[in-house]
Amino acid sequence: MFRFNFRREISKYTGIYHRKIHSGLEDAGPMASRLKSRSVVRFSGPDTVKFLQGLLTNDVRRFGESSGEKNSAVPTPNMASVTNPPMYAALLTPQGRFLYDFFLYSPSRPDEKLDRTGSGPGSDSGRDGSVELFADVDVDVLDELLETLKKYRLRSKVDIENVAEEFSCWQRYGRNLTGSSSVGWGGGVDRAGESTASGNKYGWQWYKDPRLECLGYRSIFPSDATPPLVEADKETDESNYLLWRLEHGVAEGSAEIPKGEAIPLEYNFVGLNAISFDKGCYVGQELIARTHHRGVIRKRLIPLRFIDSNGKELNQKIAAGAEVVESGTGKKMGTVSTALGSRGMGVMRVEEAFKPSAELAVKDSEEVKVEAIKPTWWPAEWFQQNQSGVAAA
């Protein structure tokens, strides 16, 4: 089976990055990227929600609720019929370390979609009452992920299927994004949405990224179709999506979140809406709950900028795993997890990284200085907790 190695492919686009960053990535957009680093898995069967609820960090129960219970109105061209937005979640080891991340989607059922005229509900033919969910997952660990899920399945009535050939993952991001929460079935008779839904019983549409508004829109679409609005946007390589995430300090997949090692709270999974503290037990829940209620997360994933002594950006290749130290003393402050050109991100000691007097550098490359960047989306208490030692994670 074809496998896309994102670590290897990213190295090809360093030149693209150099040109992009100096033209102002923060002002670029809108852009759309097909995410070759991601794949799609389908879950179906009466035990789908129960099965995932016992495994994942987020509360999956809302996918089992009938949309009719929430909204009894007949869908109209001015009323979106899709009521379940996507969800971000993770599967952990029993010790509470990161294994895999998931973007979960609930497709529109046929009776929840408008007909082709946009004037009424579609046919409910083929509905068998079972729950169906799709997951956008890391392609590099797909086979391992499927084996792990099937190991946990036991007697659960849930089918787990690789549908990578049928569907692709996409992201829309950057500045000046046009509204797209109503694109597709149930969001009005939009010709771009119709062209994508045509011949596709699922009627996929764009959704706001469940992690952060600044990340844009995300969804999965049939592999043989162009998603709505992509033709109007600039379709660009996935490396630019990595750059966008580096700007905001958001990691994704096992290439950036070390499998079996990373502590989800240090990778800001609470702020990324990936963890529910009200759902009850799941695999690895004990460590997450204990760490959260202890109150202080001293290390977090932080955006980094690599510069010289004059503050000029350095487009040098910084390897993942490189240590960031305090200049002069050599005290370790953190570790680079991902880097491309002059930008990166790493798990750092928050208090030390953001000290005004902090002088950081890459270990054994003292000419490469490191600047920690405060993400605009971070809640104020994340900065305060390391000063007071009492704020919640």
Swiss-Prot record:
<comment type="similarity">
    <text>Belongs to the GcvT family.</text>
</comment>
<keyword id="KW-0496">Mitochondrion</keyword>
<dbReference type="GO" id="GO:0005759">
    <property type="term" value="C:mitochondrial matrix"/>
</dbReference>
<feature type="transit peptide" description="Mitochondrion">
    <location>
        <begin position="1"/>
        <end position="70"/>
    </location>
</feature>
<dbReference type="GO" id="GO:0005829">
    <property type="term" value="C:cytosol"/>
</dbReference>
<comment type="function">
    <text>Folate-dependent protein involved in Fe/S cluster biogenesis. Functionally complements an E.coli mutant defective in ygfZ.</text>
</comment>
<dbReference type="InterPro" id="IPR017703">
    <property type="entry name" value="YgfZ/GcvT_CS"/>
</dbReference>
<keyword id="KW-0808">Transferase</keyword>
<dbReference type="InterPro" id="IPR045179">
    <property type="entry name" value="YgfZ/GcvT"/>
</dbReference>
<keyword id="KW-0809">Transit peptide</keyword>
<dbReference type="Pfam" id="PF25455">
    <property type="entry name" value="Beta-barrel_CAF17_C"/>
</dbReference>
<dbReference type="GO" id="GO:0016740">
    <property type="term" value="F:transferase activity"/>
</dbReference>
<protein>
    <recommendedName>
        <fullName>Putative transferase At4g12130, mitochondrial</fullName>
        <ecNumber>2.1.-.-</ecNumber>
    </recommendedName>
</protein>
<dbReference type="InterPro" id="IPR027266">
    <property type="entry name" value="TrmE/GcvT_dom1"/>
</dbReference>
